[in-house]
């Protein structure tokens, strides 16, 4: 067991086995029934009630805990109206009805209306243009179709990117409003039976959600970079960068169908067609729509519940575990299914303490508020405690909504080997093999190529994903450079109730994880990870998997630059040859793509040199760690590892730059970040990758040099940890 002596590993395994016997699905079910009983969005009475109930439980179990409050901007709807004004008239309902057999779907007085938070106020009328998913590539296709959205209201379907990208790109192209609807092709009847007969989105179901421009910064829009405490300096609303530039409203496919059916113009390309019984057309016109939204721009309180278990020997090294407790409505799946696992972990750890267990490091258990609106509670807490976290935070482990199926682990690749080791020790409740083995089998079974099947058989560790944004790890990894993991289960329970009134106990107990057995598995997995990190003599970071992953990222950006150069040259050649005009269908003409200048060759030597230094340092650390672990880990037992651990914690910090990424300084990590045009989706080596994607060649050269230096700095931090560790031998 990495980071342990032979003797301490045996003791740790015994304590972990005791812990894994404690989580009980009956407890998880009872917590879920309580927490999801009523709507509990930010500012609601039940949001506060839930926070106080969680606080009472963890105190009752014997943990030191408190609620930390922040005051954040949270707009709620004042007026919403959407109507088709030509060629016929239709008024959208903009309501989700009660469903028979689902008691909490009738709690309309407490439910937030269907809306997108952080849309600006607006009252606009214009022609309707269908933009598919509303991502940048769709606007390139519209340009070839000869369709402009300038002065139009666009309608985009949910999917392909985070929702906030859709109004952002629409505004960049001159649109005056944005509608976002859930097409049954993505999560409705095309996928299976709709709720309540099945798990998928009913015709009137609507996906609420934030459209805050989180790729700029998450958290309270008025206090970027600082905690939203009572005395904090706040921006004026007119100064906020993260509000949309045009009004936005989400709608159901029942409300979208009459609008789409009223459109004419060119038939939408085949990949743009959803599953409504209409002919999908692009427009513009003759459909004209009137959209009006206005909001109460109020400040609301957040209630973060923070519990601590003090470390016995290294109290100033923190292992932080978090899950949010707020929801858009009742939120049984998102987030309560994850929050109940964290509650059961807290109960289990408290039980072990009564049996005599004490962690070496401090464990901090966090139940965040305000995640749904823009990662508010976690971001404000992290910004408020930034200095202390930079000194003390070793690892952050996050979870969110949890379902049935396979382990999904993403995070810092310095922790890839560690979480693989944890996964080998957890039994899957259905397959009765380890969750690691079940995931390995799935990866072997799914790929089409022999090479892809071979890797999970031959590589020592299963690869974990990289983190972008979309949950409460963002402030820790993206802003502060704290090594992080995001854990959960899924893949066997599909559905279409996300951010609707139908995400409730009635749905989850039938279609989610009915017996809460994967809730138990999440508690076992995350709790074991927390214990193993908190109890290790030497923090179990590993740099072999990390450098292997960085090598892949470097290869990817080099190939991206080469491929883009070749594509631009080939496209220019085709334009000069008259190819597009010659093969165009006269009855369905497309404009040729714009001709572009061939990009310069990029010099990747600084990035390659930085990687080489990082790789050498990783090898040195592996050798030092192997020597320290030899002979049962006597070297670990016979000396203080405080400095070695401090230097290991500093490695992830070395992957950040204080001035952050281009045009978004809040995002300081140079290896992982949410994409500027993907939102939640990660971009690895983001400064380099996105400057290439956006064809900013001078910026790309600058970023290659900056990131190369960051890799060198990380290598120096790893070498320092290796030297400290070797000093005891």
Task: For every predicted segment, state its role.
Residues 4-8, 14, 33-153, 184, ...:
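Noncatalytic luminal/extracellular "stalk/propeptide" segments of secretory-pathway proteins
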Residues 14-22, 36-45, 114-119, 153-160, ...:
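Second-shell loop/turn segments in exported
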Residues 31-34, 66-67, 128-131, 153-157, ...:
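Structural recognition of the beta-strand scaffold that forms the well-ordered cores
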Residues 89-91, 202-267, 314, 370-509, ...:
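Metal-dependent peptidase/peptidase-like ectodomains
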Residues 106-141, 216-333, 347, 351-355:
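Soluble metallo-hydrolase cores and metallopeptidase-like ectodomains found primarily
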Residues 128-200, 312-318, 328, 343-344, ...:
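A conserved hydrophobic secondary-structure block that centers on an alpha-helix together
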Residues 184, 305, 321-375, 380, ...:
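Alpha-helical metal-binding/catalytic segments enriched in His/Glu/Asp
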Residues 630-729:
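C-terminal amphipathic alpha-helical interaction region
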């Amino acid at each position: 067991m990495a980071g342990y002596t032979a003797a301490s590993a045996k003791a740790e395994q015994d304590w972990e086995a005791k812990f894994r016997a404690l989580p009980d699905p009956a407890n998880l079910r009872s917590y879920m029934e309580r927490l999801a009983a009523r709507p509990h969005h930010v500012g609601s009475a039940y949001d506060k009630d839930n926070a106080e109930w969680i606080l009472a439980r963890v105190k009752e179990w014997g943990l030191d805990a408190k609620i930390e409050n922040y005051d954040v901007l949270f707009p709620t709807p004042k007026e919403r109206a959407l109507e088709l004004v030509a060629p016929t008239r239709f008024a959208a309902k903009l309501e989700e009805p009660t469903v028979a057999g689902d008691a909490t779907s009738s709690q309309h007085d407490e439910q937030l209306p269907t809306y997108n938070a952080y849309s600006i106020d607006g009252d606009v009328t214009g022609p309707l243009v269908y933009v598919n998913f509303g991502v940048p590539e769709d606007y390139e296709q519209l340009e070839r179709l000869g369709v402009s959205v300038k002065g139009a209201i666009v309608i985009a379907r949910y999917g392909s990117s985070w929702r906030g990208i859709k109004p952002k790109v629409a505004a960049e192209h001159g649109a005056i409003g944005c509608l976002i609807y859930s097409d049954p092709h993505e999560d409705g009847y095309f996928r299976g039976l709709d709720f309540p007969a099945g798990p998928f989105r009913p015709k009137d179901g609507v996906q609420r959600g934030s459209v805050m421009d989180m790729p700029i910064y998450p958290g309270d829009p008025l206090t970027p970079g600082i905690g939203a405490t009572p005395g904090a300096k706040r921006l004026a609303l007119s100064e906020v960068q993260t509000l949309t530039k045009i009004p936005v409203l989400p709608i159901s496919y029942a409300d979208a169908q009459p609008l789409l059916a009223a459109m004419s113009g060119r038939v939408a390309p085949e990949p743009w067609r959803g599953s409504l019984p209409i002919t999908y057309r692009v427009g513009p016109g003759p459909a004209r729509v009137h959209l009006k939204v206005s909001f109460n721009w109020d400040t609301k309180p957040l209630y973060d519940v923070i519990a601590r278990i003090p470390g016995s020997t290294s109290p100033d090294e923190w292992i932080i575990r978090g899950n949010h407790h707020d929801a858009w409505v009742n939120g049984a799946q998102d987030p309560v299914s994850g929050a109940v696992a964290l509650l059961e972990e807290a109960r289990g750890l408290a039980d072990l303490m009564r049996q005599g267990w004490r962690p070496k490091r401090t464990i901090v258990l966090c139940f965040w508020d305000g995640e749904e609106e823009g990662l508010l509670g976690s971001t404000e807490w992290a910004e408020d405690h930034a200095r202390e976290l930079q000194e003390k935070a070793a690892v952050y482990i996050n979870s969110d909504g949890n379902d049935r199926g396979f382990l999904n682990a993403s995070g810092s690749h310095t922790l890839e080997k560690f979480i693989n080791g944890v996964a080998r020790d957890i039994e899957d409740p259905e397959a009765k093999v380890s969750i690691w083995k079940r995931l390995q089998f799935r990866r072997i079974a799914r790929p089409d190529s022999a090479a892809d099947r071979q890797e999970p058989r031959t590589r020592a560790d299963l690869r974990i994903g990289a983190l972008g944004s979309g949950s409460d790890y963002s402030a820790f990894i993206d802003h502060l450079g704290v090594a992080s993991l995001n854990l959960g289960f899924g893949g066997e329970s599909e559905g279409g109730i996300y951010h609707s009134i139908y995400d409730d106990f009635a749905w989850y107990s039938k279609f989610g994880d009915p017996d809460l057995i994967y809730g138990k598995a999440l508690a076992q997995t995350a709790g074991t990870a927390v214990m193993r990190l908190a109890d290790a003599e030497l923090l179990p970071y590993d740099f072999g998997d990390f450098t292997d992953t960085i090598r892949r990222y470097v290869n990817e950006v080099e190939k991206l630059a080469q491929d883009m150069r070749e594509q631009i040259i080939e496209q220019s050649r085709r334009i000069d040859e008259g190819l597009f005009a010659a093969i165009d269908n006269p009855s369905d003409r497309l404009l040729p793509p714009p001709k572009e200048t061939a990009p310069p060759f990029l010099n990747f030597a600084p990035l390659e040199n930085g990687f080489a230094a990082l790789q050498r340092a990783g090898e040195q650390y592996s050798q030092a760690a192997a020597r320290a672990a030899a002979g049962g880990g006597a070297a670990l037992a016979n000396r203080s590892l405080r400095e070695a651990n401090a230097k290991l914690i500093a490695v992830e910090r070395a992957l950040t730059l204080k001035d952050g990424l281009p045009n978004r300084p809040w995002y300081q990590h140079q290896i992982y970040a949410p994409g500027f045009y993907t939102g939640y989706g990660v971009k690895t080596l983001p400064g380099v990758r996105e400057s290439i994607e956006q064809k900013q060649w001078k910026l790309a050269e600058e970023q290659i040099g900056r990131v190369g230096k960051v890799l060198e700095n990380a290598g120096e931090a790893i070498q320092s940890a290796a030297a400290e560790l070797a000093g005891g031998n």
